[in-house]
Structures are given as C-alpha cells and as structure tokens.
Swiss-Prot record:
It comes from the Eukaryota. Transmembrane segments: none annotated. Residues 1-23 form the signal peptide. Its main location: secreted. Keywords: Amidation, Repeat, Secreted, Signal. The modification Leucine amide is found at L48. It comes from Eumenes pomiformis. This is Venom peptide 3. Residues 24-37 form a propeptide. Not found in venom, suggesting that it is a minor component. The keyword rRNA processing does not apply. AXPX repeats lie at residues 23-26, 31-34. Expressed by the venom gland.
Length: 49
C-alpha cells in the first residue's frame, strides 16, 4: 500500500516536472529583458522614425 502511494506521488511529480510545472514562478512575458540597460540613442531614433 505504501509502495503504491509513493509510486503515485513520484509519477505525479515526474509528469508535472515534464510539463514544466514546478515551484519556480514563470518569468513575466511583459517584463523588460534588460531593465538596467542603457538606452541607445540610435535605437530611439529608429523608433521615432
């Protein structure tokens, strides 16, 4: 009985880990990739047109 319970828990953890569901929060897709990066004047000019 105990072996079956441990086997079910291990299989659940393995499946969730395979699909990428874990304790770490997912990164915010809307976050700036480099928040401390300096603004490049050329990139600003290209954005402004």
């Amino acid at each position: 009985m105990r072996f079956t319970f441990v086997l079910v828990i291990a299989a659940t953890v393995a499946v969730l880990g395979f699909f990428g569901i874990n304790a770490e929060p997912m990164p915010d897709p809307h976050a700036e990739p480099y928040p401390d990066a300096a603004i490049n004047p050329k990139s600003v000019q290209s954005l402004l047109g």
